[in-house]
């Protein structure tokens, strides 16, 4: 008996099967029935030429050793009730300790206790913690107080985990994030707060009334923490240009670059031969400037890329006004955006809040703010990515539609009464279409099955994904810390409620990640919901809540947005669609 080893992919699992080339399709289906429990009549197996038929000659399918085939179908109700012994011992929630319960899929994340006007810090930390790559890099960080981990564990058992962290700010952040991952309760960030105040005394200022510490600006806390991480988190650069050279993690994943041009506003300076000054700047956030004409984030970002500076002009021999224009030459993977909502007022000696409503998108296209060179690299990739996402959305909608129709047919208790009108419509449409075609042509028409149509769509999406990857310039492909699509998705928001930066209340919103598939390890589609962190209170909110954070009063207004680059598509070539 001649046999060919193939791999059959079904519901995320891969099965190794020996195909008897002397048998037919029905025999092969019974083989798969013994492995998957899906009855032959409920199987849809995609092979060359379409769907595998029962009478197909397996020797004529052109199967190759190691080839992957895709199988669709689920067992009927008779088989779904078969009870199998679980592979792992089941552990119930009441039998788990706090750390195990906190790490369950879908568990509510830990909040942070307010230690006296520390909501500015709590909201900042929750959004920073939403960056998974940062958490991973912090775990690799070793500070001078690395030996404190045992004492930290001991204090944690006494409910004083926040006291056992490192005095180094970066090490303290590492310890805090780790401890937050082991509880669902409001955690006291005592040691991190002490480390923050030691490193930056401005956060240790006392309140003017003498009671406790003063409220602080969350944007200042964000900037100072990021500056410290930039100094401490050093990694090896894997790009070809600077192989193995030390680079800051922040510079690689959260820093962008501007190309700048500065020129004098007075025509006399140009007439006397003064040339424009071209330069390069590094940025760690984009500023959204707000004025009477700012209605959308795009307006504020555009305004923030032009700046007027008064400085000495050598050719004029006096001070003159210069305009500095910036264009982005590098977009980072993680992009913070700061709404410049606070303006210093001399009459009150306070940072007054600009209440104007400024809307912001869930998906940000940053290409319009880039240099012409970067635009040429990103536009083809962005346009093709949008095509791919549209095709994937259409395919997903078609699958859901088919599933609903199938469920409706299976649950229909009176087929004649329920389906007769629809059946008559289908028959009438088929007769009308048949009558409009020549008789000899009608005989040659071959109708495609749903599985064949789906396979063709999947093949089209696969080809489009490959095309996207081919459009990425070598320069961008070598920089894995840069945005390679030009598109961003919103992942976190820090908000402020109140009239000034030194008063009011800060909270944060972080988008929920999709559940992780235990078989493949990949994350499933997200449900679109968000976590709202209000100090130690954590609740789940709908996506519509985020659009209410545009401002327009003293209510919760977005202060910092954290965007993450839309990644390049992943090409799964396990399944042959040819």
Feature names for model-found ranges:
Residues 1-578:
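UBL (ubiquitin/ubiquitin-like) substrate-recognition surfaces
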